[in-house]
């Protein structure tokens, strides 16, 4: 019996195999077609070369064989070449530097492997000025004026020391007496403490304070490494030597990707050092305050390494200090080259000339810090191999720390981590966890370059020698760097030179414009939510965890997200200064916009700051120095025994021909600032007794200033001033509502109703009550029940205009009450429009729309509203959006005979077309329901 069953089974397999065993490779594939795109992910296809014969039919090849295949090709993002704008016209000839300049800007940085820009952005030429230079000579008063422009105490002249920096204080001197009774050696590497620091590039620049200046003082400090004391420069408040190597301060950090390193740290600090500055960027402190090293040149190497493989990173770092220093807070002597650069700046603002200060000397200087070195390595690991190792993030950090201490630092306090040698990754490399990394990237500071470079390694190499750390540590003593520093803006040092106030203001303006050139908002969006980073005129993509490739275009198998996070576009230009002496600018979250559930941009979408404007004729920049309280109208007062001084002006008023003294009989016209109008007699006359004949006049407000509200609130429309009768609407982010009225109207000189300073956003009562229920419902136990308009809607929610079908009346209701009433009486209440009910086109169309809706065959809930045949629901705004007439289907639902515009003939349209035409605000007359009669 068993034998017969086996035989039957074999015969069945043969029959099945014969009927369904088509060998598809019998029909070869064609070659792949050419790619549909040369970049940005195209497709290509191929087909089987089918021959329909008996074999094809008998073996069901038509059903079993795939006849066509497609695949992606050229997935690389299209390269974007760098584009420069044309040079502008030559500037006016500056009378102080006798040069003129023309500039051009980078219209588009290179990205995705595009051609870089190599041509200069600025060009200069000598010229002959037509005006005199207004910059005054340096007034040292009772001090000695050096040729460089530096002022030094007179007692320092002819003391045998180069206190001027250019030796001009030691010319024509007879015998000199030494200042100090003995010879001192300078503090090693003291010049490093006086270097400028370019925050945006992350590197030191030219000397700013002059730390060779001793000021005739013989203050000294001793080092345990040398027998002779060192003379302390006058700029230094405090110096103390130390060699500090603490074993327990070796730190490790784990990063899933480079995009998370230093993200948005210390954003409350401003680039210029002013709390209310308009351009905010994180100021980092080498290791005291933040571990942000994104601006280190090694970070670019890390970005390029991350493009080759989906990676995670472990950073291990340690600071070794040789000495600590603190600079004085006032009266710093500037270096000769920095001082000359400041003195030679033009009085008129010129970005090209002022921005060279930041190129040459950086944006900041060191106020305190340490000289020494920083052991700083960034290990790159394959993310897949780390996952397969079975180690947690904390265990990964501990293993890097443990092996570094054991192999390179030879610290005695090393606690063995068993899992560091027995995990899957270490076992592949003879128990070494570090050997399992792809490479280590050197972010080392200080020491000789040869020893610093030897600390890093790459996969496949033998790795650093065991004594490489001790050799580097020894070299740090002779070649230190500034570590653990604090910074201050170099603009603060622009003092005690001619026109210092004017030049400081120009430098602040230039710094804002200069910093904007480092903003990655100029870059195109990177694939897969990569973060763009602007390096010079090239944009790089910093890949998110799970992505890699030259432009982050490749995905790991476990990266499934299709969400696109939002990123900020560039700031707009500043608005004109308004009557409240404020100006503003804005930006949009559109580079790209959030899509498919992606995150919205973090931060402010608009900024405001104080500003000034001139009411006088523009006659060039005034030269304002530190010791002068000079304004634009401060002119030399003529000596005269007749005439009138400036007249007393009403509040918010000015006169166009303002001056110190007016002649007898001269008249002035009283004008009002923007947003005010003069009421009364506007003309004052100067009388012989040096008084003014004047009538009653005042400046009354005719416009409302844009209200100052909390950052979370958005004002629409956004203007500097609003005319009487104009209204604004305040809105909150999705899921929140204004905690009070949202609509305000300019009436007289104030807003109605008054806008409280405490006005903010609160969680939408509808969102809080909803849970898993529909709008207008709340969760009660495991059930959803209708909300009570009286009990559940006491908190504020936005106003809506509602139509009551029962009474045929429209009224203003809160959104909460509307949804609650609609839940209780589902067909009685209808949404008309957002905001309170006010007579006008919006209300008229809303009521007409409800009449048309009675004939609609489509009813789709959409936010507070219901969309009908001629509309679609916007998922982004939860509002009904009208279709264009050509977008309507060509069906015969609810036909009407209508007359459109000036046409005399009737036309048959369906309900969708009728609603779409009316929504477009075109005139339509309904002649009769159904088709038009011929």
UniProtKB/Swiss-Prot annotation:
Protein's cellular compartments: Secreted; Target cell membrane
Signal peptide positions (record): 1-21
UniProt entry tagged with the keyword Repeat: yes
Residues annotated as domain TSP type-1: 22-79, 81-134, 565-612
Subunit structure, as described in the record: Component of the membrane attack complex (MAC), composed of complement C5b, C6, C7, C8A, C8B, C8G and multiple copies of the pore-forming subunit C9.
Protein purpose: Component of the membrane attack complex (MAC), a multiprotein complex activated by the complement cascade, which inserts into a target cell membrane and forms a pore, leading to target cell membrane rupture and cell lysis. The MAC is initiated by proteolytic cleavage of C5 into complement C5b in response to the classical, alternative, lectin and GZMK complement pathways. The complement pathways consist in a cascade of proteins that leads to phagocytosis and breakdown of pathogens and signaling that strengthens the adaptive immune system.
Official protein name in the record: Complement component C6
């Amino acid at each position: 019996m068993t034998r017969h069953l086996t035989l039957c089974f074999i015969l069945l397999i043969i029959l099945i195999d014969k009927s369904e065993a088509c060998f598809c490779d019998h029909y070869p594939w064609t070659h792949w077609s050419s790619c549909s795109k040369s970049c940005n992910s195209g497709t290509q296809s191929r087909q089987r070369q089918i021959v329909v014969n008996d074999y094809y039919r008998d073996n069901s090849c038509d059903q079993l064989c795939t006849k066509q295949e497609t695949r992606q090709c050229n997935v690389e993002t299209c390269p974007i070449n760098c584009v420069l704008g044309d040079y502008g016209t030559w500037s006016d000839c500056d009378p102080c530097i006798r040069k003129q300049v023309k500039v051009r800007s980078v219209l588009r940085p290179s990205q995705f492997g595009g051609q870089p820009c190599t041509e200069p952005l600025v060009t200069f030429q000598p010229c002959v000025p037509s005006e005199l230079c207004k910059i005054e000579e340096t007034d040292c008063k009772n001090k000695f004026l050096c040729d460089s422009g530096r002022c030094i105490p007179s007692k320092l002249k002819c003391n045998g020391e180069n206190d001027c920096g250019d030796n001009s204080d030691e010319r024509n001197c007879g015998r000199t007496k030494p200042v100090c009774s003995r010879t001192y050696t300078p503090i090693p590497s003291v010049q490093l403490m006086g270097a400028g620091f370019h925050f945006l590039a992350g590197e030191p620049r030219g000397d700013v304070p002059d730390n060779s200046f001793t000021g005739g003082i013989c203050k000294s400090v001793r080092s345990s490494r040398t027998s002779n004391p060192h003379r302390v420069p006058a700029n230094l408040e405090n110096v103390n030597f130390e060699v500090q190597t603490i074993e327990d301060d070796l730190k490790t950090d784990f990063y899933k990707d480079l995009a998370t390193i230093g993200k948005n740290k210390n954003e409350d600090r401003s680039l210029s050092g002013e709390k209310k500055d308009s351009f905010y960027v994180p100021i980092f402190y080498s290791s005291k305050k933040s571990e942000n090293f994104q601006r280190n040149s090694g970070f670019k190497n890390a970005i390029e390494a991350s493009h080759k493989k989906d990676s995670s990173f472990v950073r291990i770092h340690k600071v070794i200090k040789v000495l600590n220093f603190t600079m004085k807070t006032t009266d710093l002597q500037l270096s000769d080259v920095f001082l000359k650069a400041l003195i030679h700046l033009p009085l008129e603002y010129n970005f090209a000339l002022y921005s060279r200060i930041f190129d040459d000397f950086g944006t900041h200087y060191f106020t305190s810090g340490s000289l020494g070195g920083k052991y700083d390595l960034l290990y790159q690991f394959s993310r897949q191999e780390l996952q397969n190792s079975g180690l947690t993030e904390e265990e990964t950090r501990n293993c890097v720390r443990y092996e570094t201490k054991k192999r390179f630092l030879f610290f005695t306090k090393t606690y063995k981590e068993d899992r560091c040698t027995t995990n899957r990754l270490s076992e592949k490399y003879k128990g070494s966890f570090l050997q399992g990394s792809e490479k280590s990237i050197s972010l080392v500071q200080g020491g000789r370059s040869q020893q610093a470079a030897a600390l890093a390694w790459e996969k496949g190499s033998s790795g650093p020698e065991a004594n490489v750390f001790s050799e580097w540590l020894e070299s740090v003593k002779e070649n230190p760097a500034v570590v653990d520093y604090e910074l201050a803006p170099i603009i603060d040092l622009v003092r005690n030179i001619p026109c210092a106030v004017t030049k400081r203001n120009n430098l602040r303006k230039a710094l804002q414009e200069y910093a904007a050139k480092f903003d990655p908002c100029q870059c195109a969006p990177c694939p897969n939510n990569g973060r763009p980073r602007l390096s010079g005129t090239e944009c790089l993509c910093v890949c998110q965890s799970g992505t890699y490739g030259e432009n982050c275009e490749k995905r790991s198998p476990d990266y499934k997200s299709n969400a696109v996070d939002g990123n900020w576009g560039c700031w707009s230009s500043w608005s004109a200064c308004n009557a409240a002496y404020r100006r503003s600018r804005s930006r949009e979250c559109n580079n790209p916009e959030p899509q498919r559930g992606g995150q919205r941009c973090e931060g402010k979408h608009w900024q405001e700051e104080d500003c000034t404007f001139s009411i006088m004729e523009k006659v060039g920049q005034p030269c304002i120095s530190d010791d002068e309280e000079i304004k634009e109208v401060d002119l030399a007062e003529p000596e005269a025994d007749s005439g009138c001084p400036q007249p007393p002006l009403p509040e918010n008023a000015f006169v166009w021909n303002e001056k110190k003294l007016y002649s007898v009989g001269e008249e002035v016209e009283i004008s009002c600032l923007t947003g005010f109008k003069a009421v009364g007699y506007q003309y004052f006359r100067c009388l012989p007794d040096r008084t003014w004949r004047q009538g009653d006049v005042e400046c009354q407000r005719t416009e409302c200033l844009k209200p100052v509200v909390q950052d979370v609130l958005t004002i629409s429309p956004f203007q500097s001033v609003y005319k009487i009768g104009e209204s604004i609407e305040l809105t909150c982010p999705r899921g929140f509502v204004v905690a009070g009225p949202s609509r305000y109207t300019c009436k007289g000189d104030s807003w109605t109703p008054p806008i409280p300073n405490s006005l903010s956003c609160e969680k939408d009562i509808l969102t809080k009550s909803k849970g898993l229920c529909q709008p207008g419902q709340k969760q009660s136990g495991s059930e959803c029940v209708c909300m009570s308009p009286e009990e559940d809607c006491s908190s504020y929610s936005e106003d809506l205009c509602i139509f009551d079908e029962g009474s045929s009346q429209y009224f203003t209701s809160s959104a909460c009450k509307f949804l609650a009433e609609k839940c209780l009486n589902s067909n009685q209440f209808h949404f008309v429009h957002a905001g309170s009910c006010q007579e006008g086109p919006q209300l008229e169309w809303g009521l007409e729309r409800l009449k048309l809706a009675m004939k609609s065959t489509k009813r789709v809930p959409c936010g507070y509203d219901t969309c009908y045949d001629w509309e679609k629901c916007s998922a982004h705004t939860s509002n009904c959006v009208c279709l264009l007439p050509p977008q309507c289907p060509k069906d015969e639902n609810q036909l009407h005979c209508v007359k459109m515009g000036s046409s005399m003939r009737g036309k048959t349209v369906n309900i969708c077309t009728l609603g779409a035409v009316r929504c477009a605000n075109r005139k339509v007359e309904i002649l009769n329901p159904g088709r038009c009669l011929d």
